[in-house]
Amino acid sequence: MENLKKMAGIKAAEFVSDGMVVGLGTGSTAYYFVEEIGRRIKEEGLQITAVTTSSVTTKQAEGLNIPLKSIDQVDFVDVTVDGADEVDSQFNGIKGGGGALLMEKVVATPSKEYIWVVDESKLVEKLGAFKLPVEVVQYGAEQVFRHFERAGYKPSFREKDGQRFVTDMQNFIIDLALDVIENPIAFGQELDHVVGVVEHGLFNQMVDKVIVAGRDGVQISTSKKGK
């Protein structure tokens, strides 16, 4: 599995060239993309500026001497490469398993090209088997939790080391055990209207390309948006 992730990450780095502003994703597959960008800077003299999607990726990039700017210092991002937890046939996805969904969506939005790198196990017919992360402000989080409970969404606060997990933006994450999401776009809009919700892990029709590593090699699928 790790080898497949590495294949996808290295392939994605081929979409990066000199002079670009590059969004560096977060997660186990995006990790290999960041490593490859670091290698190309060191060995090939690649010249780019990067923005990161989490404190974890910032630390990795700094260790590789990748030049960084904050998202507020750039007008746009040429290409962002990130992982995904699930991807359906309509190019909708669930992200946020690593807890960085808000920053990931902030960086993805001004990106001219948005690419996901995944192994073939992440491809699904319908989203929802992977718990959907919802980032909520700490104030009133229990109210949001009870709202989800009443709606039958089987919520649980994400925890780490026996404490509630706190994101880089100092928010909590409520994971929803939905089993299947029949209409991701409508459900995303529903979550957008819940007061106290900062962002959710549904990335609907945002991605341009999905690079999939599997037993038969690396395949690249292009969405309608990316054509």
From Swiss-Prot:
UniProt pathway: Carbohydrate degradation; pentose phosphate pathway; D-ribose 5-phosphate from D-ribulose 5-phosphate (non-oxidative stage): step 1/1
GO-annotated molecular function: ribose-5-phosphate isomerase activity
Known EC number: 5.3.1.6
BP-aspect Gene Ontology terms: pentose-phosphate shunt, non-oxidative branch
SUPFAM superfamilies: D-ribose-5-phosphate isomerase (RpiA), lid domain, NagB/RpiA/CoA transferase-like
Residues binding substrate: 26-29, 82-85, 95-98, 122
Keyword set, alphabetical order: Isomerase
Active site: 104 (proton acceptor)
InterPro entries registered for this protein in UniProt: NagB/RpiA_transferase-like (IPR037171), Ribose-5P_isomerase (IPR050262), Ribose5P_isomerase_typA_subgr (IPR020672), Ribose5P_isomerase_type_A (IPR004788)
Known role: Catalyzes the reversible conversion of ribose-5-phosphate to ribulose 5-phosphate.
HAMAP family: Rib_5P_isom_A (MF_00170)
Family classification: Belongs to the ribose 5-phosphate isomerase family.
Subunit composition and interactions: Homodimer.
PANTHER family according to UniProt: RIBOSE-5-PHOSPHATE ISOMERASE 3, CHLOROPLASTIC-RELATED
Protein name: Ribose-5-phosphate isomerase A
Upper lineage: Bacteria, Bacillati, Bacillota, Bacilli, Lactobacillales
Record gene name: rpiA
